[in-house]
Structures are given as C-alpha cells and as structure tokens.
C-alpha cells in the first residue's frame, strides 16, 4: 500500500489538472443536523434533532478543476448496477478524449463494464491506491456539501434532493 501511494504521488505532477475527473459517492439523509451550536453564556442551547425513522440516499458526482460535474442522487445504496447506470447516463456524456477518471476501489467501481464505458469516450480510468481517500479531493467537497445540508436540515427526500442541487450549483473554482 505504501508503494502504491508513493507511485501515485510521483505521477501526480505529470498530470494535466484540466483533464482530471475525480468520482466518489457519499450518503445523505433526512436526519442531518449541525453537530454544534451557539447560545449566550449561561443559557442552554435548545435545538430540534430528529429521532425515529429517516431516509438515506446516495449522492455521486465528479469533480473537475472548474467544479462539480454529473451529479446523481439515488434512493438506494450504491452497487455495481447503479454505478454503471450513473456512468452511462450521467458521466460518460460529459467526458472528453484524454481525460482521466479517478476513483477509489469500491467494489461497485470494479464491476464489468465500468472500464469499457469510460474508455469508450476516449478517457482513461485510474484507481486510487487502496485506503487512500485523502488523495481524492472530492472528499473535501463532500464535507462542504454535508455541512450545507446539516445547516439546511431538510426532513423530506424531495427537499433534501432540491437542497443538494442548490448546493452543487454553488461549487465553483473560487
């Protein structure tokens, strides 16, 4: 693993950042709340936190130098079939020859047809070294996305999906 990480870091300076597309997925749910709050000294902070049943969805997207690309929300956990559908319908139409699609080693990313779908567009597929989420910059974008979702506190799936769309449109290079 150490050798794979060293090889990855050695190759990075040779890559054209405008050709990189980082892909990952994250879970979102209707029970997301801020982990901390503020109130006047000596006063008790009172906030509503959902209990009971909530819905979880999966958000998958790509990150380019100029922002998020090909966002996709699905009301199910990620599996190979869903990921392949995402590639064919959302990501592949946005890819150009020479681009490098980079993703982690999730089993859903290794199903038959993934590499072929990406390479059919003229792009290449690179897998990150195992256990290396720190090498995928989309992780920081997802942390920011989740912070916005916690702040919004949406409690229904349609409202959550609308909020995801609003936040994703705000991801720009600045």
Task: Tell what function each PLM region has.
Residues 1-174:
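Short functional hotspots at interaction and active-site rims
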């Amino acid at each position: 693993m150490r050798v794979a990480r060293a090889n990855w870091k050695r190759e990075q300076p040779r890559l054209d950042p405008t050709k990189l597309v980082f892909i990952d997925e994250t879970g979102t749910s209707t029970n997301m709340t801020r982990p901390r709050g503020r109130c006047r000294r000596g006063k008790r902070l009172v906030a509503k936190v959902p209990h009971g049943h909530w819905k979880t969805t999966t958000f998958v997207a790509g990150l380019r130098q100029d922002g998020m690309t090909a966002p996709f929300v699905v009301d199910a956990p990620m599996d190979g079939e869903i990921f392949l559908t995402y590639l064919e319908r959302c990501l592949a139409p946005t890819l150009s020859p020479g681009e490098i699609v980079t993703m982690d080693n999730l089993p859903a990313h290794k199903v038959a047809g993934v590499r072929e779908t990406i390479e059919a567009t003229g792009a290449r597929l690179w897998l990150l070294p195992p256990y290396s989420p720190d090498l995928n910059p989309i992780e920081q974008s997802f942390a920011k996305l989740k912070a916005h979702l916690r702040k919004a506190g949406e409690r229904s799936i349609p409202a959550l999906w609308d909020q995801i769309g609003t936040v994703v449109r705000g991801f720009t290079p600045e």
